[in-house]
Amino acid sequence: MHVPQTILDQPLTLPNGAVVKNRLLKSAMSETLGTREGAPTPALNRLYRAWAEGGIGLCVTGNVMVDLRALGEPGNVVIEDAAHLAALQAWAKAGTANGTQCWVQLNHPGKQAPRGLNHETVAPSAVPFRDDLKAFFATPRALTGAEVRALVARFGKAAGIVKQAGFTGVQIHGAHGYLVSQFLSPHHNLRTDEWGGSPEKRRRFLMEVYRAIRKATGAGFPIGIKLNSADFQRGGFTEEESLDTIRALAHAGIDLIEISGGTYESPAMTGVKSGREPARESTRQR
């Protein structure tokens, strides 16, 4: 008996020619199973091997940071250099079993790091959290221009190590109010230099991160992004700006775009826009 192939079973060919064996994607989650030094662990290997052997086409790792001084939560894996290359290779081997694409999501929390976890928090601008969150999150220090450029380089260097370890792609975390998302947002980014102001200048950090990763990994290595459809926050990143950003990324050669929404102050990704206002049904379904 012939069983018709569903669209979920069909391979997906990305713009750079890489093929995902089916349309099933495990989106990034923050497993917090890294060591104190930021290395992946056997627990992560077991988890990702189980997902790979389950038949998923693309598995995206959760919340891998590019700076040990800037953790989003305890237990984050961190890639600053090749110090943990052997552990990363073991993780990649597990995650790419069974013909699975396994991509590393690279991130920097910016201001969204709990008090006491890091020496200080940094962001595009020194914009405090709203009053009911100030007990949990400190007001960040605004990054200098030199620090912004250094962070771009960190993303590129981390991506090169990801490829060296044997992972098959990278995803930029550009959603949920983390650093890339903060640069995109007119609420969080009040800069008047080349990194802020107009929508084009606010997305410059993202575009430079993308270019640094592409330079470090080459044309054949898939690069994706997790991007907010909107921040769902007054004065934040809008749907129109999101569409313009998608067009800019598509023109630059991005391979895959995953849409989400919200920030810690307006957590639409959890089904709630704010502490009092439910998100739309379409957001909850995402």
Feature annotation, model-predicted:
Residues M1-R286:
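Flavin-dependent oxidoreductase catalytic cores
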